[in-house]
């Protein structure tokens, strides 16, 4: 099976998992809470969704087609309702907004944020 960009789905999933594991590594010394959250997400089906969005740059299409589902609810304590903050022009792309998504006073990945960040 291929993503919208023509890339094989398994390769996209691996990219997504790798990306999340990199985030976990980055946060490991700074915030064990976030590191644990990203590690958990890396081994869930949510990595596929992230990977497809990154690989194909089709976050708006995915959000509009309601393919995105909240993985946070399956990775407690990483649950959040998402409120986005404005970003300066160079940082206003969907991926940056996604990474800086705010939820209940904590930073957390919450897939409905994609729909709000566009």
Swiss-Prot record:
Source organism of the structure: Saccharomyces cerevisiae (strain ATCC 204508 / S288c) (Baker's yeast)
Keywords: Autophagy, Membrane, Mitochondrion, Transmembrane, Transmembrane helix
Effect of gene knockout: Increases frequency of mitochondrial genome loss.
Coiled-coil stretches: none
Described function: Involved in selective mitochondria autophagy (mitophagy).
Compartmental location: Mitochondrion membrane
Membrane disposition: Multi-pass membrane protein
Gene Ontology cellular component terms for the protein in this record: mitochondrial membrane; mitochondrion
Domain of life: Eukaryota
Main location class: mitochondrion
Tagged with keyword Membrane: yes
Transmembrane annotation, as ranges: 7-27, 41-61, 98-118
Protein name as annotated: Altered inheritance of mitochondria protein 26, mitochondrial
One GO biological process term: macroautophagy
Transmembrane helix in keyword set: yes
Lineage: Eukaryota, Fungi, Dikarya, Ascomycota, Saccharomycotina
């Amino acid at each position: 099976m291929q993503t919208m960009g023509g890339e094989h789905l398994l390769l996209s999933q691996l990219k997504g998992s790798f990306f999340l594991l990199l985030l976990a590594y980055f946060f490991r010394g700074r915030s064990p809470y976030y590191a644990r959250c990203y590690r958990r997400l890396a081994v869930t089906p949510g990595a596929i969704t992230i990977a497809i969005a990154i690989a194909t740059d089709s976050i708006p299409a995915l959000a509009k087609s309601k393919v995105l589902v909240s993985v946070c609810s399956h990775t407690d304590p990483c649950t959040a309702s998402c409120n986005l903050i404005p970003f300066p022009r160079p940082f206003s792309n969907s991926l940056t907004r996604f990474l800086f998504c705010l939820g209940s006073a904590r930073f957390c990945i919450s897939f409905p944020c994609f729909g709000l960040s566009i």
